[in-house]
Design a protein with these regions (language model features):
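Short, glycine- and charge-enriched coil/turn segments that flank and shape catalytic ligand pockets
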Residues: 3-6, 22-31, 100-108, 151-158, ...
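Flexible hinge/switch segments at interdomain interfaces of large molecular machines
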Residues: 9-13, 53-54, 97-99, 209-215
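Active-site neighborhood for divalent-cation/phosphate handling
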Residues: 49, 53-152
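Adenine-nucleotide phosphate-binding core of ATP-dependent small-molecule kinases
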Residues: 208-236
């Protein structure tokens, strides 16, 4: 909840999916529906402003530096830039931007964020089937930056700060410099570590996933880490 300029967390829930969404042959929509059903059975969401995030690999984040421009002309110039940067016809995407102004410099840097309407509708359909109607959609790396910017007061930081968020299918790298950020998503995530374990030990994906999760306490920790080493090398 908000109290003036302060924000506090009043409640939260962690609801793991019944199966990892990268499990081969899984019905992602059905597993997601089951998790959402569990959420609404535990939390009263009626009347709440619902915000959902999409992973970085499902959307686009592009950054561009613009020449000095009057504030009133910025939206039109950014739209022109968005058409150049987004690899889909502009009428097929939902997009927005954030302008970053650096003190003492006339140039403006903008972050352009977009997702195809097809992907938006796919997600809204799944949410709608369980009676949830999100009002706002954002990108998970943007959410992470906003949270860390607030929690760590990055606007007062002198040096850049790097955040690495390893997801199931991809990894987001967020470089924050004060109130400005740069985001890049790489197609390497937790599923690649699981696949490496499955290949090394000739076991099923599900068993490999369990081994990965229990690696720290397993008597085979050394062998498991050895199996994942090539993926760590690619990530670094």
């Amino acid at each position: 909840e908000r109290d003036g300029d302060n924000v506090s967390v009043t409640d939260f829930a962690v609801l793991p999916h019944r199966k990892v969404l990268s499990t081969p042959d899984i019905d992602v929509a059905e597993v997601t529906r089951l998790s959402l059903g569990q959420l609404i059975s535990e939390k009263d969401l009626e009347g709440e402003h619902l915000v959902i995030s999409v992973p970085g690999h499902s959307a686009f984040a592009r950054f561009a530096k613009l020449p000095p421009v009057e504030k009133k002309d910025l939206p039109e110039i950014v739209k022109f830039e968005a058409v150049q940067q987004i690899p889909f016809p502009i009428e097929e995407v939902e997009w927005d931007y954030e302008a970053f102004h650096q003190e003492g410099l006339p140039e403006v840097e903008v972050g352009i964020f977009a997702i195809t309407r097809e992907r938006v509708n796919e997600r809204l359909d799944v949410y709608g089937e369980v009676g949830i109607s999100p009002e706002t959609l954002t990108l998970s790396p943007v959410s992470l930056f906003n949270a860390m910017n607030y929690d760590l007061n990055l606007s007062g930081a002198k040096d850049p700060v790097v955040f690495i968020d390893i997801g199931t299918q991809a990894t987001d790298v967020i470089i924050a410099t004060g109130d400005r950020c740069w985001i890049r998503t790489f197609p390497l995530g937790g599923t690649h570590f699981t696949e490496a374990i499955a290949s090394t030990f000739k076991i099923t994906y599900a068993k490999a996933e369990r081994l990965k999760q229990e690696a720290a306490s397993s008597k085979y920790a050394k062998q498991i880490m050895q199996a994942m080493r090539p993926v760590f090398a690619d990530l670094l």
